[in-house]
């Protein structure tokens, strides 16, 4: 009887031990410090531009986007292995377009200024520019001081606005009239609704060359400035890649070749 009782107790104890060993343990919790999935690699770059800014970026007779900056951007994108999309934007809202991530870069005669540097990352300058004064060929305006009492046209949101407003002569204008683009301002100059237009030299020289004898470019201007490519301040990776591509294009002569095709000479800085 004692043996039977002992055997029974041993059997119950072993069963309890086996039951305890077979208990399901909760699955270990996932480690909170796991590395996030890598961000997808970009295959395309979206360039924001003013599509009425010849010869930097504009539409030809076939409505195709062409221009000096267009060709530079295409060459840079090719070297980076990226598809390039050119997106016309309201140039006066360019910083909002860029920082709202609707475009990746601004590449269209973008002047480097200290104010813009607060919100935009810039490549090194690739071109020098002046804010020139264009008047009709028969105008009595011969110098900057002669703009007193005159109606002067300018592109809204352009660096010309800052350049003019910083000059004391601006206070003597009858009116500083702002336009959506330079071409429209020049058309108003032709029809007599403006006395003068202040605009980027590259645009003014290109436009006036198409209508010889119609305009005069004054010797006076509103200052010298430089063009750069702009990206978001925090997108240092893209900025570095664009700078590297531009440096290579300068070194191997590609930038000079593109410049010669548009301006007849190398004006790359």
Residue map of PLM features:
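A ligand-binding cleft/hinge motif common to bilobed small-molecule-binding domains
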Residues: 110-118, 165-167, 188-191, 195-223
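Bacterial lipoprotein signal-peptidase II cleavage site
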Residues: 18-31
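Ligand-binding cleft/hinge of the Venus flytrap
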Residues: 57-59, 73-82, 160-179, 208-212
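Extended ligand-binding regions for polar small-molecule ligands
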Residues: 22-24, 70-79, 145, 151, ...
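Acidic, polar ligand-binding/catalytic clefts
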Residues: 74, 78, 83-146, 216, ...
